[in-house]
């Protein structure tokens, strides 16, 4: 006697709809996870990730101005420079690096009228409680306090809120007429940041900053962060380096010179102490200048010797000592950066 197989029960419409909905949810979750990972530009939860050192593609935008190797410069962040009606500046240099927030547009206009170019400094990788946009940062954006800098904290570089803040800062630079920007503290991965930032996070962040800056026709620099140079060199137009002689790392930054891009190099021979009056008047000794101006790997750098306060005092490698007047009634929050 044969037995007929039991026929399979046909799927009800309800079961089909439930299964289809489940599949759709899984696909959506995967898509959101992938998209979020791409947007954040890297993981924030592994300090030991190896940086992606494959050079990023060069931007297609051609800029009106980029600095040249050997360009002379002055950096004044303690207060805005006081620009008089004289036909030149003190010192008579090509570029001034000034604080974005503290420097009025009128000062930048005056520098332009004297034939100078202006690079505007801001901290891209930290929260500073005294800045006018400090209220825009969210608690989740913030990490540990920078060692030695009360009121300043590392930030999560992949945060969309943080990136929006930096976009507005770059737009402020354009509105003020800055020719370039000097975004600082992009090397949080080298410090105890409390956010598990990696080199890949910094690389992705620099790519984002470039995508905002270049369409606004401004050049952009890399501040320190020597270990990511090979990846981001195509994105940036210059380096601003602090203390590569002191830390024996100038050879890393020589890659900029090899690529035809300048290195604006700062050394602080007196450390964080006050300069003696004789040094302020006459400059450092010849031996000190030789040490900080002719170090291994620094050939072609545009070197200045400065106080840690980054006020108007500067000495050049030829022994010239110059003092830029400052507007002490304006600003006063800019300060030097070298977090170790």
Give the predicted meaning of each segment:
Residues 16-47:
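Alpha-helical transmembrane segments in eukaryotic/viral proteins
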Residues 14-16, 47-340:
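Glycan-processing catalytic domains of CAZymes
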Residues 1-16:
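Intrinsically disordered, low-complexity terminal tails of fungal membrane proteins
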């Amino acid at each position: 006697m044969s037995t007929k197989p039991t026929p399979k029960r046909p799927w009800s419409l309800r079961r089909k709809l439930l299964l289809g909905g489940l599949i759709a949810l899984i696909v959506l979750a995967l898509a959101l996870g992938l998209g979020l990972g791409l947007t954040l530009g890297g993981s924030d939860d592994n300090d030991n990730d190896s940086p992606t050192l494959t050079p990023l593609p060069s931007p297609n935008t051609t800029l009106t101005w980029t600095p040249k190797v050997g360009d002379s410069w002055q950096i004044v962040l303690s207060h805005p420079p006081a620009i008089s009606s004289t036909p030149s500046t003190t010192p008579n240099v090509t570029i001034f690096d000034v604080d974005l927030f503290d420097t009025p547009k009128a000062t930048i206009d005056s520098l332009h009228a004297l034939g100078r170019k202006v690079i505007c400094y801001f901290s891209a990788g930290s929260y500073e409680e005294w800045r006018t946009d400090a209220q825009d940062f969210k608690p989740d954006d913030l990490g540990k306090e920078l060692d030695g800098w009360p009121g300043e904290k590392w930030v999560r570089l992949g945060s969309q809120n943080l990136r929006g803040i930096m976009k507005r800062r770059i737009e402020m630079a354009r509105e003020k007429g800055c020719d370039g920007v000097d975004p600082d503290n992009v090397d949080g991965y080298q410090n105890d940041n409390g956010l598990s930032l990696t080199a890949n996070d910094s690389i992705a962040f620099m790519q984002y900053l470039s995508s905002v800056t270049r369409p606004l026709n401004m050049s952009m620099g890399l501040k320190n962060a020597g270990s990511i140079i090979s990846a981001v060199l195509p994105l940036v137009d210059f380096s601003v380096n602090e203390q590569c002689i002191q830390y024996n790392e100038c050879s890393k930054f020589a890659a900029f010179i090899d690529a035809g891009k300048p290195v604006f190099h700062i050394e602080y021979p007196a450390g964080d102490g006050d300069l003696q009056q004789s040094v302020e008047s006459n400059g450092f000794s010849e031996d000190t200048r030789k040490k900080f101006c002719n170090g291994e790997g620094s050939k072609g750098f545009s070197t200045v010797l400065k106080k840690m306060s980054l006020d108007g005092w500067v000495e050049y490698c030829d022994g010239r000592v110059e003092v830029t007047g400052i507007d002490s009634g304006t600003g006063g929050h800019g300060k030097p950066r070298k977090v170790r």
